[in-house]
Amino acid sequence: MNKISNKKIYGVVICYNSEHVIKDLYNRIDQEMFDKIYFFDDNSRDNSFEVAKGFDWHVIKNQTNLGHGGNLKKAIKTAFLDGADYVLEIHADNQYNPNLIYEAKNFIEQDYALITGSRFVNKNPYIEEGMPFLRYFSNKVMSNFTKKLLSIQLT
């Protein structure tokens, strides 16, 4: 059982060609906050799959590259079919801090159906985390477009 809640919390690591950061990611994750962690390698061309097998994760390699969205859908479906109450997406490239799940504890206890976070609320990841400018810029443009289109607050 995880140390956050009596709900089953599974992590799903989404990976493509990330062998050079997997060990750092593993060391960064507080393993006790999850009941289970799946690692989904999206048919990487490097040794990501082999590196991930060295850790206490359930490692799955796609036979074809599904793209980020397809890999994520497969991972979430697998986790829920395996009994997860909540699933946390973890990017293998370390661009998101997986330990921020502690911030969601109260929402988990209140049985929220969806909990989402933003890395843009209190900081600028382009400056503070070395996010590529094009990625940062496109995220901001799409968020602003979605805010206008749906009349909702996004960061």
Predicted regions located by residue number:
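Short, well-formed alpha-helical segments that are part of the catalytic scaffolds
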Residues: 17-31
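A conserved acidic beta->alpha catalytic loop
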Residues: 41-49, 94
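Acidic helix N-cap motif at the loop->helix transition within catalytic regions
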Residues: 20-23, 46-54
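Short beta-strand/loop segment that forms part of the nucleotide-sugar
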Residues: 26, 34-43, 60
